[in-house]
Amino acid sequence: MWTKPAYTDLRIGFEVTMYFANR
């Protein structure tokens, strides 16, 4: 199973990536 901290960090990283990609 995924650990919550790792999952959250991955999600945040994905959010940031999408944010910069949309710029």
Swiss-Prot record:
Transmembrane segments: none annotated. Pathway: Cofactor biosynthesis; pyrroloquinoline quinone biosynthesis. One of its GO terms (biological process) is pyrroloquinoline quinone biosynthetic process. Belongs to the PqqA family. Keywords: PQQ biosynthesis. This is Coenzyme PQQ synthesis protein A. Pfam families: PqqA (PF08042). There is a cross-link at residues 15-19 (Pyrroloquinoline quinone (Glu-Tyr)). InterPro entries: PQQ_synth_PqqA. Required for coenzyme pyrroloquinoline quinone (PQQ) biosynthesis. PQQ is probably formed by cross-linking a specific glutamate to a specific tyrosine residue and excising these residues from the peptide. It comes from Pseudomonas putida (strain ATCC 47054 / DSM 6125 / CFBP 8728 / NCIMB 11950 / KT2440). The gene is pqqA.
